[in-house]
Structures are given as structure tokens and as C-alpha cells.
Amino acid sequence: MKRAFIMVLDSFGIGATEDADRFGDVGADTMGHIAEACAKGEADNGRKGPLNLPNLTRLGLVKAHEGSTGKIAAGMDGNAEVIGAYAWAHELSSGKDTPSGHWEIAGVPVLFDWGYFSDHENSFPQELLDKLVKRANLPGYLGNCHSSGTVILDQLGEEHMKTGKPIFYTSADSVFQIACHEETFGLDKLYELCEIAREELTEGGYNIGRVIARPFIGDKAGNFQRTGNRHDLAVEPPAPTVLQKLVDEKNGHVVSVGKIADIYANCGITKKVKATGLDALFDATIKEMKEAGDETIVFTNFVDFDSSWGHRRDVAGYAAGLELFDRRLPELMELVGEDDILILTADHGCDPTWTGTDHTREHIPVLVYGPKVKPGSLGHRETFADIGQTIAKYFGTSDMEYGKAMF
């Protein structure tokens, strides 16, 4: 029985790429800087001491980081026995965003340039805003700027509740984000507005990767909270991913846990499972792994590393999240059968010690575990698509256009 379990630790980069200068990210190192802060006692809020990831270390994480950066992460064991195969991978795609990273993991790099709303104030074209107001019958809008999602709620959340005007904002990513209160504005109404925005952005030729619904609750600045009802409306990948090939060519199954289905615009997904928070994502993943039959991929995105700690530049929170992940990792490993493979990876970086609030251009770890996987280094991979090609070879689908199988 052949099954592949892919776990994306969203934003867990392991050191700047060779082209990081193009992105202003020279020196970025999500893992290394978290480990450094922990070793210095600067991340003791809710946790304590050096970064403690024994299970990820056994799968080759410290070695992969060393390959990427040339040094062993502070306070971590560079001499631990390694029981998995490990690599560090460079992104071929032109961006450092979620769809680009995930699509490339599945064998389809993004070789075109996304559209962006680069102006920090008055970010969106007036023509687009006017169409949204008219089509959705809105009383107006708030925001129209670059912002962190939590900051803008404190700034505009109360006014939104009073006026019913949705909050429009963006970032350095190719996104159009809409924040609305679940109760005063309504979740269904927010989703409908996002559908309209997706249509207008596509028809207008803006080439924007995602429209993101950002629902929140609370009654005043300081206690607004984003909920787990986020919804991403992505464009479809430009070519069939390995997920699609498994379904089409092998009559296989692809189970999305978390936001995976949204990222691939539901292409190549046969089952969707929603879950919010690290523990809930783990629980859902374990359930699906136990139930998975032959020719199945279970694909989980652990978004909290990015959304809760990376973008918010919360080093201690990120470290605590990694340690929780590591503590629960053996639960996944013990479900890996004789012919199965478990792949742990990331989609980009988001160094919580870096300036600003945006992603960072970094190598990603590629950690592969299974009874038939030979432990040791798989070296520097020139594209994330090597993961997709490896999975294609494993399941016996037609080759992907990009990437080289790692084994």
C-alpha cells in the first residue's frame, strides 16, 4: 500500500537563498534566529531555554539547516543520529508567497510574475473599489492600505462595526484581503463579497494570487480576534500538479487538512477537512492517516507558524509552536507504514526577528521518513518541485515538467 503524508510547516525557512538580495532578505533565517533567541534566553515567554526539537533533529532538520547556512543552529545538537533523509531546497518561483511555494512543492513552479498592490496607502485602483461597492451594495469601505491583519482590526474594527463598511487591505504578497465582523457583517455576506472581489480581480486582469476572507469577533479594539473561518480564493495552478495527476491517472485520493484545498483552488483534492490550531490540525491529520487507503496523499498545512507567529514577529510563540509540533511528531511517525513516506517541509520563510511583517526568501527543509527511505543527505535541491517529482515517481504517475526525483 502506497501513501504519502505531506506536512507543511508554513513559513519555516532555514536560511536565506542565494537570490535573497532581490527580496531584501539577505541574512534572513527563520529557524536559526529563533534558535539563537532561545539560546540567549530571549524567548522564555511561555516556554524556556534552548530550542528543543529532538524528533525533528532526528529527521535531519539541524543538518538541513547546516547545509543551508553553513552553521549549526544555536543550542541544537549537530551530532544527533539521523534516521531520515534530508535536504534544503531553493525556490524556482518568482515570489515568496503561499501559492507559489505550495504549487512548486506539487511540481508546478510559478514562472510568471504575480500582480501586486505596491502602494502602502490608497493601495487599490479606484475603478476596482467602485465596482466592489456597486456590485456588493456596500456603504463604502475602510483601509485601502498595507497592514498587518491584527493591527488593522485595532485601528478600524470599531468603525467597521458601526458603519458596516468592510476593511480592505493588502501586503507585500499578491493578496486582496477583506476583514469583516462575523456577527455584525455576517460570514456568508463576507464570503459573497470575496467571491465578487475574486471575479473583479480576474476579469480586470490584475493577476492577484488570492482573495482572503478574514472574519473576526470581539466588541472593541484590543479584544478583536480573527476566527478559524478564514477562506482563501486562489486562482488555479497553471498546470496539473502531482495531486491532480494522482487523482486523474491513478484514481487516487488527496485529502486536504487545513487550508491546502484553498491554496490549490480545490484542484486535485478529493476530500477537505477543516481544522484550526496546531493541536486540531494534528488530530485531524492523525485521523485521516489512520483511515487512508492505497494511492492516497494526506496533505496538511500548519498555518499557525506563519499567521500567528511569523507575521506577528512573535519569536517565543513560534518557538513554542515548533516544540509542540515536535512533541506530537512521533504520533505521525508511528502511523507510517512499510511502503509509506512522510515528508515535512515548508513553503517560504517568515523570520520573526526580521524587519516588517512580510515573508522572507529562504531555503525550505525537506525531511523524508519511511521504513524504505535511506537516511542521509539529499543535498541542495534547486527547486521545491523535486518534492513533486519524487512523489510522482513514488506513485508511478507521468513525470512532472519540473524537478528531479530525490530518490
From Swiss-Prot:
It catalyses: 2-deoxy-alpha-D-ribose 1-phosphate = 2-deoxy-D-ribose 5-phosphate; alpha-D-ribose 1-phosphate = D-ribose 5-phosphate. It comes from the Bacteria. GO terms for molecular function: magnesium ion binding; manganese ion binding; phosphopentomutase activity. One of its GO terms (cellular component) is cytosol. CDD domains: PPM (cd16009). GO terms for biological process: 2-deoxyribose 1-phosphate catabolic process; 5-phosphoribose 1-diphosphate biosynthetic process; metabolic compound salvage; nucleotide metabolic process. Its cofactor is Mn(2+). Binds 2 manganese ions. Mn(2+) 1 binds at residues 10, 347-348. InterPro entries: Alkaline_phosphatase_core_sf (IPR017850), DeoB (IPR010045), Metalloenzyme (IPR006124), Phosphopentomutase_DeoB_cap_sf (IPR024052). Mn(2+) 2 binds at residues 306, 311, 359. Its EC number is 5.4.2.7. Pfam families: Metalloenzyme. It is found in: Cytoplasm. Pathway: Carbohydrate degradation; 2-deoxy-D-ribose 1-phosphate degradation; D-glyceraldehyde 3-phosphate and acetaldehyde from 2-deoxy-alpha-D-ribose 1-phosphate: step 1/2. Keywords: Cytoplasm, Isomerase, Manganese, Metal-binding. Belongs to the phosphopentomutase family. Isomerase that catalyzes the conversion of deoxy-ribose 1-phosphate (dRib-1-P) and ribose 1-phosphate (Rib-1-P) to deoxy-ribose 5-phosphate (dRib-5-P) and ribose 5-phosphate (Rib-5-P), respectively. This is Phosphopentomutase. It comes from Klebsiella pneumoniae (strain 342). The gene is deoB.
